Amino acid sequence: MRWTKEELDRYHRQMILPQVGPEGQERLKRASVVVVGAGGLGVPVLQYLVAAGVGRVGVVEMDRVEVSNLHRQVLYTTEDVGEPKALVAQKRLQALNPLVRVEAYPVRLTSENALEILRPYDLVVDASDNFPTRYLVNDAAVLLGKPLVFGAIYQFDGQVAVFHHPTLHGEMGPCYRCLFPKPPPPGAVPSCAEAGVFGVLPAVVGSLMAAEALKVLLGIGKPLAGHLLLYDALEASFRKLTVRRNPRCPVCGDEPTQRELVDYEAFCGLR
């Protein structure tokens, strides 16, 4: 593949890595990723995927920018308050790297539109902040046969995993439901608005999520398939747990019983 001077100048320090090279950079250029959520976690994921040269990146986010977002969602500014996050993110990301294509979906992801929105992309990233969306994104990714990079944060703690992707041993790794078959009771886990979040935590966890996404796209290293990575910002410590696919999982098991998307608000006991 022939590279333009702008591409070589922009990606040179990534392309000289032996694990990437021109072939890996071409893989990124041809790849597509959709990120569900353009908040604390989604912002660093989007920034690093776009900067790395992933050819097509989708942004799914229904919320508008709020002042309370700005201590951790550094893609947005005070002037953006009240504007749709997806559209602001699209504009800023396109300015960051005009060589890639950024697609905005300023809508709520639902059982009715999830398959249509996620289907065109190679990889799905779940940067959402609520349980109905997490189960929805997981189930949609499994039904579509897409790998899923997952992240979550709470106060000073973060989690990262790669779901529905082969492990180093060759078997298919677990999905989100294999780890969490049932959601917690409504109100049992406070939101960031209720419990708070350390401002830099989303940047750390989101960057780890971006790294996992790039590893999967490039086919390098050891993606977190079959593992759950735990980060404690107060202790500056990491733990990596081994997790396995549940052969009886209703979505990704040997004989799945759920072959379509459901009402996830009802599934999570929210109505």
UniProtKB/Swiss-Prot annotation:
Enzymatic activity may be regulated by TtuB conjugation. Zn(2+) binds at C175, C178, C249, C252. It catalyses: [molybdopterin-synthase sulfur-carrier protein]-C-terminal Gly-Gly + ATP + H(+) = [molybdopterin-synthase sulfur-carrier protein]-C-terminal Gly-Gly-AMP + diphosphate; [ThiS sulfur-carrier protein]-C-terminal Gly-Gly + ATP + H(+) = [ThiS sulfur-carrier protein]-C-terminal Gly-Gly-AMP + diphosphate; [TtuB sulfur-carrier protein]-C-terminal Gly-Gly + ATP + H(+) = [TtuB sulfur-carrier protein]-C-terminal Gly-Gly-AMP + diphosphate. Binds 1 zinc ion per subunit. Its EC number is 2.7.7.80, 2.7.7.73, 2.7.7.-. Its cofactor is Zn(2+). GO terms for cellular component: cytosol. InterPro entries: ThiF/MoeB/HesA, ThiF_NAD_FAD-bd, Ubiquitin-activating_enz. Pathway: tRNA modification; Cofactor biosynthesis; thiamine diphosphate biosynthesis; Cofactor biosynthesis; molybdopterin biosynthesis. There is a cross-link at C192 (Glycyl cysteine thioester (Cys-Gly) (interchain with G-Cter in TtuB)). GO terms for biological process: Mo-molybdopterin cofactor biosynthetic process; thiamine biosynthetic process; thiamine diphosphate biosynthetic process; tRNA processing. This is Sulfur carrier protein adenylyltransferase. The lineage of its organism: Bacteria, Thermotogati, Deinococcota, Deinococci, Thermales.
